[in-house]
Amino acid sequence: MSAAALKTITKKYGNILVNGAQVFEDLKNMKVIPVSPSLDYALGGGFREGTWIQMIGDPKSGKTTTALQFAATCQKKEYGERPIFYINVEARLSTKNFEGIEGLQADKITVVQAEEEPLSAEQYLGAVEKLVKSHPNCVVIIDSISSLIAQKDLDEEVRGDYRPGVPKILSNFCKKMSSVVPKQKAIIIMVTHFIANTAGMGKKKVADGGVKVRYQADTILEIAWTQAWKEKNEGRQIGQVMHWKIVTSALGGFVGGEAIGWLRYGLGIDKKQELFEQANDFDLISSAGAWYTCDFLVENPELISGPLKENNIDLEDKEKITKFVKFQGQQKLREFLDENKLWDILENSLAEMLS
């Protein structure tokens, strides 16, 4: 392209011509924020700023909890203390959503919701547009896009004999905001429901919201199924296990793979349980029946030199060290890792192995 042509384009449209190397460098400099140990591994690191995330699943499957847990991480100083906006479309936000998420600062979340009269899809998405444009590095959780309703539908009587207009509105919203989100380094999380596939072909359930939303999303996660998480002894349900399918990831990751998330009631995503499961899978913690051995400590006894010294165990005595870090049941193992503040060390050991 000639210099004259470049000058003409720049004069007419502004500085829209950018060197490819600069674009590549800008993408590399985008921060990646962790979600949970299991999802981070499957996604290739977590969620990258400047991207769109779609979380799809059945009701009560853990989508909102996961989104709010991510918000809690984004509130931390090391991740920029980002502004959090929760778009409460479903109007079902409850105290348990706030109290049941470890580390979540409710006083630092701005909730957008209807007062007396319901808000239309156009109004909600218009508010999101203004918030993203005026708040760099923000995180917006739209919960859910499946519950949005067009102004036209709000103004008319309830009917079921025509196609609703929300997919078109969402399509226009995505087009309008596609270049704004990366420029503002924002993260938009679109919580989405599964709906019945009435086409009669293919999957029984499909994601609500239209095709354009899926085209726009940089990362798409589906909760394929869930199961009850119960205590082994008492049989009391303490949470649920989420089986995530990685449809696509902005960071590459394992597309088509599965990530198993552990949601503990009253806590949110149980990151320690996920670390334990990963460590067990990759033999940093071995198991034999109900017994668990911290092999990563057997191989690196200097990490627990203090406790070993207190128990008169020599750093070279591998047999005694193995007995010292062997526990009957997960609970005793967790207590040991808690008491000796070893979770970060375990996480770093996993990161080194998987990098």
Task: Give, region by region, the residue ranges found by the protein language model.
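Conserved inter-motif catalytic segment of the P-loop NTP-binding fold
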Residues: 69, 74, 78-163, 167-172, ...
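C-terminal regions of RecA-like/P-loop NTPase motor modules
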Residues: 1-22, 228-355
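Short hinge/gating elements
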Residues: 52-57, 157-164, 200-203, 257-265, ...
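The Walker A/P-loop phosphate-binding site
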Residues: 2-108, 126, 133
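Conserved, well-folded catalytic cores of nucleic-acid-processing
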Residues: 12, 16, 42-46, 58, ...
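N-terminal cationic and glycine-rich segments that engage phosphates or anionic surfaces
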Residues: 153, 196-200, 288-291, 321
